[in-house]
Amino acid sequence: MSLDFLILYEHTVREYESDLLLKLELEKRGYTAEIRQLLDPKRLKYFTWKKPKVLVSSCMYDNEAINSHVYNNIGRCNRIVNLHWEQMLSDTQEEGDWFNFSGNAKKCIQTCWGSRTARRLMDHGMEEKNCPVTGAVMMDFLRPEFRGYFEGKEALCRRFGLDPVHHLHLYISSFGYASMTEEEVKSLSEMAGTDFSGFARTNRVSMEQTLAWFDRYLAEHPEVDLVYRRHPSEWNSPQLEELAARRPNFHVIFAGSVKEWIVAADSISIWMSTSIAEVYMAGKSCLILRPVPIEHEYDPVIYKGGQYRTTYEEFAAGMAEENPEFPIPKEVIEGYFDPSPRPAYLRMADLLEQVYTQPPRDEPMGPGFTPHFNWLKYFALWGVHLLFALHLEPRKVFFFHKGLADFAQRIYGYVEKAHVSPAQVRAMEERIRPFVEGGEKA
């Protein structure tokens, strides 16, 4: 029996919850759907008796991506829908070639969260039929239809040992470069072909001054608990440890999703995180803290024209406001995140149904595309997954060959980070299913 939809994900935290919501809706409509990770071993069944009718990808930038993500997973297929997870870009990225797709990737269906992204893609040569606006599925969990999906403030505070009576302020950090050494920044710059030294300096200065603001404010306001939601790459930060030791109402917490902290928080501040869109979709406001300007080539374009708090006094004044105005113009944020009265997962499922039932809109694997099967990757993935199942790290197994050990260990790290256990999947399904079943009737 063939499979109707195969959904591929890359980053678990970013994508899996939304993919599962979409899968459950498709199953509710009577279709078959499965979710797999991009680095899962290739399986014969997806090329033969269980070949999917529609391939739903997480990214699809060029012909090599079509080959790697589609051809090497299921063979030939012209029904390719990209969930297009990277849409919050800087102005430099929006103008460049990579994020506007090349080759036959322009013939795939590149879904768009809002009209501004669709217009940009059309300005760069895509046809309107291939860049439909669906809204952002991950934002649906913040809609009124999903009320009760996240814990309330009291339950969340008790889970993390915070006083629910206190004012809960959430800071969403993006200081990923602040904890990197000069040598690490240099190495990253050489690898990417871009000099990140200036932006790393902006990270450090911004973090230092922001923490100074928090230190002063928390000393004056013991009734406020500030939860510092660190960036995933913010590690080994003595500044955070020192402030947490000095101020008992400063808490560095990474556990829990950023969405549930947004829903629970009494007030929110942010630097340059794209989570500002989630704040808006949750019906809340926030303060944009910018002690120093951010280089435009790194600043998400959604922040353009925003209202920044650049001094401690402006930050403190914002904290005193009961309902501060949202710092980004409505037309800008809704241009990137379509505010349809209908949830995005339903609109996305509608699109997938159309793609399934109608002839292919285009030919991504037609002229201009040359398929090739990557046998090295095929055997490497099976080998690494075997080591992962046996809990054997490649650097220990291949100690006799540094090059092989490093190569296999890198893939092993990706596999380990993306792994979702069957128990975790069941728990997420049980949590999401009631909202799908109670939603729009099929």
Language-model features, listed with the residues they occupy:
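Active-site and donor-binding regions of nucleotide-sugar-utilizing enzymes
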Residues: 4-150, 174, 234, 276
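Short amphipathic alpha-helix with an adjacent loop that forms part of the alpha/beta core around
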Residues: 44-50, 158-160, 318-322
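Short active-site oxyanion
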Residues: 53-55, 105-110, 225-226, 264-267, ...
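Short, conserved active-site loop motifs that form the nucleotide-linked donor/cofactor pocket
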Residues: 108, 131, 249-251, 306-307
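Conserved catalytic-core segment of nucleotide-activated headgroup transferases in glycan assembly
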Residues: 147-242
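Donor nucleotide-activated moiety binding/catalytic core segment of transferases
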Residues: 227-277, 282
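Catalytic binding pocket for nucleotide-activated donors in carbohydrate/polymer assembly enzymes
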Residues: 242-245, 267, 274-342
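C-terminal amphipathic helix plus adjacent low-complexity
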Residues: 317, 323-442
